Amino acid sequence: MNIYKKDFPIFQNTSIIFLDSAASTQKPRCVIQELVDFYSTSYANVHRGSCDLANTATQKYENARQKVANFIHAPVKQIIFTKGATESINLVASGFSRLLKTGDEVLISESEHHANFVPWQQACLLNGAIFKAVRISEDGQLDISDFKAKLSKKTKIVALTHVSNVLGVKNPIEELIELAHNVGAMVLIDGSQSIAHMPIDVQALNCDFFVFSGRNFARTVDCRDGILVHYFTVFFQQAVHGGGNGAD
């Protein structure tokens, strides 16, 4: 057994060969233990109480936000915890559904996960915006010429995967982001499959939204599994999402 697999309790059963990490990774012992320790010693609602436990839980929660920000080189205030990458995309699409007008265009690619396909399709249906998908070639590469042909001043948002969850193809997102910004379009990048395999610097990428899910790189699966990095605070005033208790 290699040194990495030794960190994962599930692989103590040496008959297991797990090839579905693109959907969700197994969890290392340190992550499992941290979760057990938190539930055993520190559990309380965050940002909602004044007792010692609540203060400790809130501090741990915000420490996690800072670690995420450091990991992807993002301003900590731009990090939003969500239920998953799917909810992150839906949150952005929900905001755009209130901004799009008849004749506006949304551009994605044919290689998108359904989570980055259906929300934009539905957002366009709500208000008569035009939904466009860039072709992929026979070897799975995004067709750059088709991207350029379908990109226009009418394009309001470009939503693309960084790395395909099916094909493993890495899109040239730096070039695509620049092309989109040149026509005034915002860009959302789905980094769910790239986050575990390459360094990510969202400020260098210069995208407007970057989403990923912790479960794709050995994080626990819980009610705050997703990460959304955003650079347009005003934009989110358009999105009504959730409810429940509030705080000033």
Predicted feature residues:
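Pyridoxal 5′-phosphate
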Residues: 1-248
